[in-house]
């Protein structure tokens, strides 16, 4: 049985990474695909754990070689998912989660129409502003650009299957887990997973 591909996207500052990490800790059946990026590591980020950090030249070389499942220019830096991180795992029956932006999500849905997509929204613009400023990693000009980009990104929430409002962290994580559980209980998935049982019941 082929694995399920999950897509999680959100504007910067909505708490996407924290929710994803907490969800994966509760649901070990899903593997997180580590993205490639051309940007420099932020304080505390480690290569191959948070991102695969490569130069812009290396990233372009991977594009030309057709190595990416999806890629996009995000906030002036390249981000992408390697084919090798996704296709073999799905074919082997493993579930894979992509933590990407809406541009990458659009590309993925074109290639995998049955992918399950989730968009995370902040509870308010004020909360988004406060969360982004708490990072303390960007100048005021960069912060203004990120806030403007976040508002643009939120316009694309309608392209996703599910929407989570990250007002209370634990609730948001529980809702994400519920989405994964519901996905596994879809009729098509259950028919494949329990084909023998269903056949025996109906004979």
Swiss-Prot record:
ATP binds at residues 10-17. Its main location: cytoplasm. Pfam families: Guanylate_kin (PF00625). It is found in: Cytoplasm. The keyword Repeat does not apply. The keyword Secreted does not apply. It comes from Xanthomonas campestris pv. campestris (strain ATCC 33913 / DSM 3586 / NCPPB 528 / LMG 568 / P 25). Essential for recycling GMP and indirectly, cGMP. GO terms for molecular function: ATP binding; guanylate kinase activity. Gene3D superfamilies: Guanylate Kinase phosphate binding domain, P-loop containing nucleotide triphosphate hydrolases. HAMAP family: Guanylate_kinase. CDD domains: GMPK (cd00071). One of its GO terms (cellular component) is cytosol. The lineage of its organism: Bacteria, Pseudomonadati, Pseudomonadota, Gammaproteobacteria, Lysobacterales. Its EC number is 2.7.4.8. Keywords: ATP-binding, Cytoplasm, Kinase, Nucleotide-binding, Transferase. NCBIfam families: guanyl_kin. It catalyses: GMP + ATP = GDP + ADP. Residues 3-181 form the Guanylate kinase-like domain. This is Guanylate kinase. Belongs to the guanylate kinase family.
């Amino acid at each position: 049985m082929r694995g399920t591909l999950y897509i999680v996207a959100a504007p910067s500052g909505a708490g996407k990474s924290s929710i994803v990490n907490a969800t994966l800790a509760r649901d070990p059946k899903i593997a997180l695909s580590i993205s490639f990026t051309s940007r420099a590591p932020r304080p505390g980020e480690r290569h191959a754990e948070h991102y695969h950090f490569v130069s812009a030249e290396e990233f372009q070389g991977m594009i030309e070689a057709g190595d990416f499942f999806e890629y996009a220019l995000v906030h002036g830096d390249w981000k992408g998912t390697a084919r090798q991180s996704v296709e073999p795992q799905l074919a082997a029956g493993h579930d894979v989660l992509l933590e990407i932006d809406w541009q990458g999500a659009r590309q993925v849905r074109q290639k995998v129409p049955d992918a399950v997509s989730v968009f995370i929204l902040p509870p308010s613009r004020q909360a988004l502003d406060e969360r982004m400023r708490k990072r303390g990693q960007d100048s005021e000009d960069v912060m203004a650009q990120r806030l403007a980009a976040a508002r643009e990104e939120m316009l694309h929430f309608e392209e996703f299957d599910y929407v989570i409002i990250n007002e209370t962290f634990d609730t948001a994580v529980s809702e994400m887990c519920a989405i994964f559980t519901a996905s596994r209980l879809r009729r098509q998935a259950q028919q494949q997973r329990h084909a023998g049982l269903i056949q025996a019941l109906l004979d």
